[in-house]
Design a protein with these regions (language model features):
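Sensory coupling linkers of modular signal transduction proteins
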Residues: 2-10, 95-126, 313
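Sensory modules in modular signal-transduction proteins
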Residues: 6-41
């Protein structure tokens, strides 16, 4: 076995100290006895200016070469330390002579700028996440509460794929005899889509406030005018479904603006769910305005209408198969309960939802609790 003095001689005579002295990084070599075999010029200069650094380096020798610290004799270690107000990346590697552990070489690199940048990025990211959580709370708070509004009992589930969502639904009281309900899905996710949902809520309320006698088709045409005036990216669009309930004759007049998730109506008398279908184009500033066809439906006591967005039917199982419209219709026909339906979708889904999932159920014929 090689002796310690021979190892120290090897360390002092076999390294290219010219290269190490040319480095801006601090470098020192410690033999297996804990003696300093070499310190490069950059570290010598730093030691002359800092007692704190001297103390740290002395303490570090004892830590590195303690009997319990066997890992330093076999493995390269990298850690970050704050020394004299600066951040350093410290790389410690074992040195071997004739197969035996001879000592360690330490390289201290100043990474203060990088560390400050990482801290700034972390804080900025934290602020952004806090802002997104705030927006999400606002989004959730502007949705109708799960309660009864006149003859309409509403229950909803709002589950964004990200912190904020591009889905929205709302109930608007037009007058004592009529209420409007809409659901919309803005293209994309995140902050941009969530801001668009705010635009939709404000715009829809303003339209009904100014034009209470508008039909669903007229509302969509007016909404499109407001949207095109924004002069935003031509790739931005949204889909929506709008219905106006008239409690005087128990009728529902509805129109569709490209919403590819037609609501499902479940009638107690028929014990099966069916689609509320009507054609219409999505609202976009690159697609010409549509006339938006309307249909009228006679409602019965205890009818249930399920509203949803495409994240619901696009949930996938482990084989990549989508939940789909027909499965949703069948499950809604069997269950008729929004919580049970939501659980069925979650059980079917194999991974994190790729899109926002929004469900809203209206039961017709409840008592007024307002």
């Amino acid at each position: 076995m090689t002796g310690s003095l021979e190892k120290t001689h090897y360390l002092r005579e076999n390294f290219n100290f010219f290269i190490l002295n040319a480095m801006d990084d601090w470098v020192r070599i410690i033999d297996d006895r804990g003696e300093v075999a070499f310190v490069n010029d950059a570290l010598i200069d730093a030691l002359d200016k800092s007692e704190t650094l001297k103390t740290y380096l002395d303490d570090n020798i004892d830590l590195l070469l303690s009997n319990s610290n066997e890992v330093v004799k076999t493995t390269t270690m990298i850690e970050e330390k704050l020394i004299d107000g600066k951040y350093y990346s410290i790389k410690t590697s074992p040195i071997f002579y004739d197969g035996d552990f001879a000592g360690t070489i330490e390289v201290y690199r100043d990474i203060t700028s990088e560390s400050i940048l990482k801290i700034d990025l972390y804080n900025a990211n934290k602020d952004m996440i806090d802002d997104l959580r705030f927006v999400r709370r606002i989004q959730a708070s502007i949705l109708p509460k799960n309660k009864t509004y006149g003859k309409l009992k509403i229950s909803g589930i709002y589950n964004p794929s990200e912190k904020v969502s591009g889905d929205i639904y709302d109930l608007i009281k037009i007058d004592e005899n009529r209420s409007a309900f809409y659901i919309a899905d803005v293209m994309g996710h995140g902050v941009k889509a969530s801001i668009m949902t705010m635009f939709l809520k404000v715009s829809m309320s303003a339209i009904f406030d100014k034009h209470p006698d508008y039909s669903p088709s007229q509302v969509f045409l007016n909404l499109r005018k407001k949207f095109t005036k924004l002069e935003i990216d031509s790739s931005q669009y949204f889909t929506a479904w709008l219905g106006i309930f008239d409690f005087r004759d128990d009728s529902l007049v509805f129109a569709n603006a490209g919403h590819n998730c037609p609501p499902l109506i479940y009638r107690q008398s028929e014990k099966i769910a069916d689609y509320l279908l009507v054609s219409g184009r999505m609202i976009s500033n690159i697609i010409e305005a549509d006339k938006y066809k309307e249909k009228t439906l006679k409602l019965e006591e205890n009818d249930k209408i399920l509203f949803f967005t495409d994240g619901t039917i696009e949930a996938k199982n482990e084989n990549g198969k989508e939940y789909g419209l027909e499965r949703l219709r069948e499950e809604f026909s069997k269950k008729g309960d929004i919580q049970a339906l939501y659980q069925n979708i979650r059980d079917f889904n194999w991974q994190q939802m790729a899109d926002d999932l929004t469900l809203a159920l209206i039961e017709y014929g409840g008592n007024d609790e307002n």
